[in-house]
Structure formats: structure tokens, C-alpha cells
């Protein structure tokens, strides 16, 4: 077999303080868009012991009860007492929300006067989309497994299977791969790491046994596990204090977990709490759809797409495609197909991906367990656009 290498991805579950903040920011966005689809939202959240603060710039016609959103989100995650890290009903909630800067408003949407195709990017920046044929989701296996372990931790906590679990937790998976002419082929899972918050009553042996039986076994396919797989299960020995009591949280600090687990590339912009004029979010969504469509259409086995913007300018400054040598046709021809089939103007992304639609916890759902590779009709950017290319090859 070809020479192998190890690659690691991590995840955190919904009770991690940073992820709590992402979810509150996106719950605010959902509430604004549900009443006013043209809401302009840049909502940040921070938290520490017994306190949550929501702050930022929001221009909306919606009537939003920010404090209620904070408390409901914390409660739904499981932060219902100081013992578990935060008491949703009794913590201090601070709100400092102002209107969007009029300078930004005139440059981006002309104070709501511009047509969709004229709407400029809400800021400069560059975003990346990635796809790989190593999983059905067309996502990296290391990232998929780490993310699913985190989601499973929450599931067995909430359904009572592992009643000793508390909301906070982190996961990490190391996969052994080999490189098949640019495509990534998983061989086995090398290491599984889980650190989960727990109550005082459970022993470390019970934690390890339950995690193997109820979390790891249902998530990681047997074919990837062998007698050499290493398990680190709560390696610190104690994780009773967690959530915002254990450490502070802030929106936008888990951007690799939100995307591709360290694969591909990242332009640095976070997603949560941002309406679709913010290309950090909408730009990243459209390039994921482009990359996924390239792989799903058989144009390449693995692919990255970059787009970049200037504030106030609708058209992207650049679009880039790299198939890591796995393309069936030259990358420049794939780039041409992408430019013909995808509209990268922010106003048109909003329409084509229906990003102004709030409600149904639409963006809240994205804020835990990843924005990509999810099988949910609200994740419109995961819909594959068929890309026709046979004719071009023959030509």
C-alpha cells in the first residue's frame, strides 16, 4: 500500500461556551429574519460565569426579545443550574445592540434601495469551499466523525442513556489516510479522543465504558476500528466544572469546526450571527455548493474553491478552483463552468440559496455540529447543482 499519513480534526458539542455563543447569535438572527427578511444583523455573544452578553449592530423591523432568546437557547442546550455551568433562568443577561453604521448601509444596500443584483458585499474578504469524495457527505472523514461523536454525546445526554453527562464536551479524531493521486482515501481510525463534562457521581471507568458503548460504537464504522486504535476518554481525569463556569465563550471562535476540520483552507471569517449580506457567511456557503457540485458531478474527486470580495462591490474580485490533480478536465475549464453556473453576487446568493428565510431554527441549527455536510432541507447550499461537462471534453 502507498505511504500513509495521519490527519486530525476536532469538534465541540453544543454545551461548549463558544458554541453556546454561536447558537445565541444565530437564534437572534433567526428571530430577526423570521419577522423581517431584510434585517441587517451582526450579532456577537460572550459568556462567563452567571452572565451572557449579546452585542453588535442590528437594523430590523422585527420586535425581538433578546433576553428571552438568550434564556431559551441556554435552557434548550441544558444549562438549567449553576452546577452544570450556567443557570438559564437566573443568570445575568446584558444587551448592547445598536443600528448598522449608516456608512456601511449606504455602501452595501443603499439604505435598502438597491436591487438584489446591485447589493454589494458587506465587507472585504476571501472564503473557501471544499469537497472530497471520501464520505457520502462529500466531507473529510476526520471532521465527519469528530462532529458526529459530539452530536451523539448530546443525544445520549438528552435521552437519558448516559444520565451522568453534562452539556460541555469536546471530541477529536485522527484518521490514517493515503494520498491516491490527490484524492484522500481513509484507511483506519488511529485515535479517538473524547473529553466530556460529567457529574460527581460517575467513575472514570464508567465514563470510558459508556463512551465506548453508547457514543463511539454507534458513530464510527467498525471497518475503521482495529486493535491498534487508541482511545483517550476523559484523559484529564476530571471534568465536572464546565460550560461558561469552566471557561469564557465568544461567538466565532470555532470556525474550523464549523467548516472542514482543518482540511482545505479558511479565510478567517466566522458565520454565526451574520445576515446574508455578510459574505463571510453567504460567500462560504456558495463556494461549498460549487465545490460539492464539482465532486458530485464527477469533475474531480477533491476540490477547493475560493471567492473574494470588496466592500460595496457586487461582483467578486476573484474566483479560484484547485482540484489537487484529481480533475477530469483542466482546472481552468472547471473554473469556467463554475463561473457560468454560479452567481457569486451577494444579493443573488441570498435569493438562490434562500438565505433571507429565518424561522424553524434555521440558522440556529447550523451553529452546532457544522454548517456543511448536513442532510437537512434548510441547508440549501448542500443541494448539488448538476454540472454538464461531457460536451466540453469532446470539444
Curated annotation (Swiss-Prot):
Top-rank lineage group of the source organism:
Eukaryota
Tell me the Gene3D superfamilies matching this sequence: 3.30.300.10
Q: Could you say which cofactors this protein requires?
A: Mn(2+); Mg(2+); Co(2+); K(+)
Keywords attached to this Swiss-Prot or TrEMBL record, sorted alphabetically, are: ATP-binding, Cobalt, Cytoplasm, Magnesium, Metal-binding, Nucleotide-binding, One-carbon metabolism, Potassium, Transferase
What are the BP-aspect GO terms?
one-carbon metabolic process; S-adenosylmethionine biosynthetic process
Q: In which pathway does it act?
A: Amino-acid biosynthesis; S-adenosyl-L-methionine biosynthesis; S-adenosyl-L-methionine from L-methionine: step 1/1
| Gene Ontology molecular function: any one | ATP binding
Cofactor note as given: Binds 2 divalent ions per subunit. The metal ions interact primarily with the substrate. Can utilize magnesium, manganese or cobalt (in vitro).
Pfam families given in the database record: S-AdoMet_synt_C (PF02773), S-AdoMet_synt_M (PF02772), S-AdoMet_synt_N (PF00438)
Subunit-level organization: Homotetramer.
Q: What is this protein called?
A: S-adenosylmethionine synthase
State the organism's lineage: Eukaryota, Viridiplantae, Streptophyta, Embryophyta, Tracheophyta
- Protein's gene: METK
Amino acid at each position: 500500500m502507498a505511504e500513509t499519513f495521519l490527519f486530525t480534526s476536532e469538534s465541540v458539542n453544543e454545551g461548549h461556551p463558544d458554541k453556546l455563543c454561536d447558537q445565541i447569535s444565530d437564534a437572534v438572527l433567526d428571530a430577526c429574519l423570521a419577522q423581517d427578511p431584510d434585517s441587517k444583523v451582526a450579532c456577537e455573544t460572550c459568556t462567563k460565569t452567571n452572565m451572557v452578553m449579546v452585542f453588535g449592530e442590528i437594523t430590523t423591523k422585527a420586535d425581538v426579545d433578546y433576553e428571552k432568546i438568550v434564556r431559551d437557547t441556554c435552557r434548550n442546550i441544558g444549562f438549567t443550574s449553576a452546577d452544570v455551568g450556567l443557570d438559564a433562568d437566573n443568570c445575568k443577561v446584558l444587551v448592547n445592540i445598536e443600528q448598522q453604521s449608516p456608512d456601511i448601509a449606504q455602501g452595501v444596500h443603499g439604505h435598502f434601495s438597491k436591487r438584489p443584483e446591485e447589493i454589494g458585499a458587506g465587507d472585504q474578504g476571501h472564503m473557501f469551499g471544499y469537497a472530497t469524495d471520501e464520505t457520502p457527505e462529500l466531507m473529510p472523514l476526520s471532521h465527519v466523525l469528530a462532529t458526529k461523536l459530539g452530536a451523539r454525546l448530546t443525544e445520549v445526554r438528552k435521552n437519558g442513556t448516559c444520565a451522568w453527562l453534562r452539556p460541555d464536551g469536546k471530541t477529536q479524531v485522527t484518521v490514517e489516510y493515503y494520498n491516491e493521486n490527490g484524492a484522500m482515501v481513509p484507511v483506519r481510525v488511529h485515535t479517538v479522543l473524547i473529553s466530556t463534562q460529567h457529574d460527581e457521581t460517575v467513575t472514570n471507568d464508567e465514563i470510558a465504558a459508556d463512551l465506548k458503548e453508547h457514543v463511539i460504537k454507534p458513530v464510527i464504522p467498525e471497518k475503521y476500528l482495529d486493535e491498534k486504535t487508541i482511545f483517550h476518554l476523559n484523559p484529564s481525569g476530571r471534568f465536572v466544572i464546565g460550560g461558561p463556569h469552566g471557561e469564557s465563550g465568544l461567538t466565532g471562535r470555532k470556525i474550523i469546526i464549523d467548516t472542514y476540520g482543518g482540511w482545505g483552507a479558511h479565510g478567517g471569517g466566522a458565520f454565526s450571527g451574520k445576515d446574508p449580506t455578510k459574505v463571510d457567511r453567504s460567500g462560504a456557503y456558495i463556494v461549498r455548493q460549487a465545490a460539492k457540485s464539482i465532486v458530485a458531478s464527477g469533475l474531480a474527486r477533491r476540490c477547493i474553491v475560493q471567492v473574494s470580495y470588496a466592500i460595496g462591490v457586487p461582483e467578486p474580485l476573484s474566483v479560484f478552483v484547485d482540484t489537487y490533480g484529481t480533475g477530469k478536465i483542466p482546472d481552468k475549464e472547471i473554473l469556467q463552468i463554475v463561473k457560468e453556473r454560479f452567481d457569486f453576487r451577494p444579493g443573488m446568493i441570498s435569493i438562490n440559496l434562500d438565505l433571507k428565510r429565518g424561522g424553524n431554527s434555521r440558522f440556529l441549527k447550523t451553529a452546532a455540529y457544522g454548517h456543511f455536510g448536513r442532510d437537512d432541507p434548510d441547508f440549501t447550499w448542500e443541494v448539488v447543482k448538476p454540472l454538464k461537462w461531457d460536451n466540453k471534453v469532446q470539444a
